[in-house]
């Protein structure tokens, strides 16, 4: 099941990013909810919240090391919690989605923008980012419930 989640997450991320490249990269913005939610193309050459700008090689290496660590953990410990395995699968699919962008584009395609008028703008993000955040929350809940 975890492999299917990872594959589905990567496919969903790729489809939405290809759509953003085609429809939004020319500077076109699609407003979904006026003054609150829109699709707006951004080439993110860093990590979350714009940190590590221009450090593509570092980000690729860190992502690869983390993926190797996760695979090692799953092979060695074979976790039994379905909730935890699903959460980690979300994290892996999101990480691999953004890794693909970094390797092939040298930046990550972001396009989801939440803002309040012109007063506040949350950093632009993508489906892979959502998967990583949801998976991390699930993993944290699992760890808190298990007391480990």
Curated annotation (Swiss-Prot):
Stated EC number for the protein is: 3.4.23.36
Q: Which Pfam families match?
A: Peptidase_A8
Q: Which InterPro entries has this protein been placed in?
A: Peptidase_A8 (IPR001872)
Tell me the active site: 110, 129
Q: Which GO terms describe its biological process?
A: proteolysis
Per the record, the similarity remark reads: Belongs to the peptidase A8 family.
- The protein in question is named Lipoprotein signal peptidase
Q: What is the lineage of its organism?
A: Bacteria, Bacillati, Bacillota, Clostridia, Eubacteriales
The gene it comes from is lspA
């Amino acid at each position: 099941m975890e492999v299917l989640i990872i594959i589905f997450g990567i496919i969903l991320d790729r489809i939405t990013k290809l759509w953003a490249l085609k429809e939004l990269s020319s500077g076109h913005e699609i407003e979904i909810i006026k003054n609150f939610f829109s699709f707006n193309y951004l080439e993110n050459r860093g990590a979350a919240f714009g940190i590590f700008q221009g450090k593509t090689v570092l980000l690729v290496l860190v992502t690869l090391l983390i993926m190797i660590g996760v695979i090692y953990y799953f092979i060695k410990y074979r976790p039994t919690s379905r909730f935890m395995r699903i959460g980690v699968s979300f994290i892996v699919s999101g990480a691999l989605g953004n890794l693909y962008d970094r390797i092939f584009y040298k930046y990550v395609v972001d396009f989801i923008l939440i803002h309040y008028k012109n007063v506040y703008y949350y950093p632009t993000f993508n489906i892979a980012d959502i998967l990583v955040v949801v998976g991390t929350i699930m993993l944290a809940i699992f760890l808190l419930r298990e007391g480990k």
